[in-house]
Structures are given as C-alpha cells and as structure tokens.
Amino acid sequence: MNKKKYLCPCCKKYVFAEGPGSYEICPVCSWEDDKIQAENPDYKGGANKLSLNECIKKFNSVLALFLTIAVFIAGLAGLSGCGTASGSTANTSANAVITDAQESTTKVSTSDNTQTRTYTFRNQKLLNSHYEKHGKDMGFSSAKEYEKAASAVVTNPDALHKTEAEDGDDVYYVESTNEFVIVSTDGYIRTYFNPDAGIAYYNRQ
C-alpha cells in the first residue's frame, strides 16, 4: 500500500493516513478505503455495497440537499430578523456540520490493544467504525463480538490465505461462511466483512 496520505475520492474532504487500501472508513461520507474499488470506480462487491461512482453520486446528492435546507433556514433567520442570509453563511454552516460530524467520530476513546495472538483492530475508533458499517449487518451484538469473530477468521486453519504483493498485508477468506479479513503488516485487523462478490473479491486481491 502507498504509505502517503490519501484524499478520500468520494467526498474529497477527508484525508486517510495512508492509502489506497487502508480500509479506514471516512468519517465524512462513510466510504471505506478499498483499493480495488479505488482503482475500479464502477466495481461492486467489496468493502462498500455501492461502487465508488455510486457513492460519489449519493454523497453529492445528500450534500446538495443539505445545502438547500441550510440556505432555506438561513433565509428564514434573515426574515425573522435573526441575521442576514447569504450563500457564504450557508456554506459556512454546511462545513461546520461536516466538521462536527467528523470530530464526533474521531473523539471516540482509544482502547488498549493487546499484543497476544488474538488479533484486534488498531484502536477503538477503527473497531467502532467497522462494527457500525459491517458488524451490525453481520448480526453481531457488540463491537467486541465482531472483533473476536474477525480474529477467529485469521486463526481458522481452513481459511484461504495470501499476502498482497504490493503492500504485504495478509488476506484471509473463509469460503463456507463468506468471511473476509485483512491484517496489516504489523498485525492489526484492517477490516472484516462479507463481500457481495464472495471468493471473486478475495481472488482479486
């Protein structure tokens, strides 16, 4: 993986610490940094249910709706004498909400990571974001339960395993349960989900 900082290709507002292929989830638009989808914007079946191009369209439509509402509210405030409405005010309000949403995500406290052979996410923030995106849909009742299951995939002797040639990350896949896990070169879980494309997604790594 490219270790340089990487601008989210969906919202173009958040910068991943590294990428593409970090599997970090953008706190602004919720796009997960999937290298295959970054390189093939129309590809479905990876870490994101929608293709990158579909995610971009969805984000832009939501942002446009929000800006329309913000302008409307600002206009009402101006009519009521609470202040003057302007396009710059609306844009400032929109950016403030996006910033607040980003900060609320990043202020989650960091948990202590264990150095045993039980694999974990790098910190609580990453665990929580992946649990919210994938774990609940997979039926797990808690983030810790989701993390424990991801670790079990890595240690499962029946799991398919390969090392990514470009970045050295370890990729694990259990075909019978359609479970996919990536572990970083320093031993932390990057992501865990059920790819819609199944083993075809694993084979593309």
Where are these regions (language model features)?
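Functional cores of ribonucleases/endoribonucleases
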Residues: 141-205
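Compact soluble domain cores
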Residues: 96-167
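Bacterial signal peptide processing site
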Residues: 83-85
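Residues immediately within or flanking Cys/His clusters that coordinate Zn2+
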Residues: 5-6, 23
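Short, non-ligating residues that shape and space the ligands of small metal-coordination modules
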Residues: 17-18, 33-36
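Short cysteine-rich clusters marking metal-coordination/redox-active sites
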Residues: 8-11, 26-29
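Bacterial Sec-type N-terminal signal peptides, specifically the leucine/valine-rich hydrophobic h-region
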Residues: 76-79
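Short, intrinsically disordered terminal segments enriched in charged and Pro/Gly residues
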Residues: 40-65
